[in-house]
Amino acid sequence: MSLGNQITNSSTAYEMAGQRALQNRCLIVAAAGNHRQPPPPDTVGQPANSPSIMAVAAVDNQLRLAPFSCGSGSVAGSKVDIAGPGVAVYSSVPMPARYAVFNGTSMATPHVAGVAALWSQATGAKGFQLWHQLTSHARPLSLPVSDVGSGLVQTV
């Protein structure tokens, strides 16, 4: 999901949707947000700050934290769970241009969602079990867990 705002309090509606999705063996993956401004860094915004929704941070091709990627906060649920490529990502745009390069946690999120689909297809995992597989198989990074969660998403 590529929605975002700078509201640090979690939303009851988003949390209920995340819980219902997990109960029905579905996983919602959302961008952590692009409004990091030290000090202290701005934290994960809605809907990714809901405990039942997986929050995705962005890293570059050198596995450095993207300077815009929000980090974990002290509010319940406002934590980064995993990271994906989110800097200089080649993506489609309307004609006539066809393609362009973008940065953002909204570029990292489809990487995580795509890998989740591969894990689900290969193992049959769904919902919370899929969440656990993604985070337990992520590549640890030499960055704070508060910024990248369990690390870089990995394929099967």
Question: For each predicted feature, which ranges?
Answer:
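Active-site environment of divalent metal-dependent phosphoester hydrolases
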Residues: 35-40
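Short acidic, glycine-rich surface-loop motifs adjacent to enzyme active sites
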Residues: 1-13, 25, 31-32
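Charged helix-capping and loop-helix junction motifs
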Residues: 11-16, 41
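Soluble non-cytosolic domains of exported or imported proteins
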Residues: 8, 12, 102, 106-110, ...
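C-terminal subdomain of the subtilisin-like protease fold in secreted/lumenal serine endopeptidases
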Residues: 1, 24-26, 52-55, 67, ...
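Extracellular S/T/G-rich loop segment that most often corresponds to the catalytic His/Ser-adjacent loop
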Residues: 26, 45-121, 152-155
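Surface-exposed amphipathic alpha-helices with a cationic face
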Residues: 15-22, 120
